[in-house]
Amino acid sequence: MAYPQLTDKPGALETAAAIRSGALSVAEAVDAAIVRLEKLDGPINALAVPDFARAAATAKAMDAGGPDPDKPLWGVPMTVKESFEVEGLPSCWGHEKLKNYI
């Protein structure tokens, strides 16, 4: 089954293939995702807790190690819902009482 292309931007599968082939680095993919988020997220405020510095550092480390063929989406940028606990980031689940829970 083919997946419909909803935008002119490459999806996760295309991005993963470009990273595996060496046509795109993880750092380039992350940088592009950050630029797009900074440009488009303002009015909708979908990104509750940006962690761009850690994303960029992780991308550099991943590029230094090379692709993992056993992980099909290796290196593809993604976001994590703030209700999942991530070390060093708040997880308030949208509740004001939990705004300082880290």
Regions found by a protein language model. Give the residues of each.
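Broad hydrophobic/π-residue packing in well-ordered secondary structure
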Residues: A33-I34, L47, G66-P67, L98-Y101
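Histidine-rich, glycine-flanked metal-binding segment
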Residues: P50-K71
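An N-terminal boundary/leader segment
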Residues: M1-A57
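Short, functionally important structural connectors and interaction interfaces within domains
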Residues: A16, R36-K39, G65, K81, ...
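Alpha-helix boundary/interfacial micro-motifs
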Residues: K39, T58, D68, C92, ...
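Enzymes and membrane/adaptor proteins characterized by extended Gly/Ser/Thr/Asp/Glu-rich
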Residues: P72-I102
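Flexible N-terminal pre-Rossmann segment of NAD(P)-dependent oxidoreductases
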Residues: P4-P10, G65-V76
